């Protein structure tokens, strides 16, 4: 069985833990509990193959900036999350999370961009609250622009409350992992030489 280590990053309260719990257990957690560091392991069948997904949840709060990168070792891919109703979390995708990952991994670990809470994008009360701060929800097109900016291999929006695209986030991640393994194999084959 193939093991895949996925680390989920993003600002606090954007729904990272809720996304992991909803995927692993099918339940929506109602209470917000700030995460320091947690991990889940779940078995998942995808395209008739079993995967052991190591899902590593990280703290988004600034207090854990020095602790968080310790969990980045041996990561197969990163999911960077922002909330579509939290514009600062979107800005931090590049300013904080992309920069931190590149600084501490220094490698070509694939990135998946995830826009959370998209069920609230058209919610009247949410839009009014954002308007009071002279802000608006992040559009899908803005998400696509950020995907290009950080070189993410995939971009998905989801809603844990409605369940929309929760599985798709992780299926996209598995596809990206599969593609990366093929690239690595081809690269190794290319670099093999035979001396006669």
Curated annotation (Swiss-Prot):
Location of the motif Effector region: 32-40
Which CDD domains did the record assign?
A: Rho
Residue positions assigned to the propeptide: 194-196
Using the record's annotations, give every residue carrying the modification Cysteine methyl ester: 193
Instruction: Look up and give the membrane topology term.
Output: Lipid-anchor
Protein name in the entry? Rho-related protein racL
Q: Which SUPFAM superfamilies match?
A: P-loop containing nucleoside triphosphate hydrolases (SSF52540)
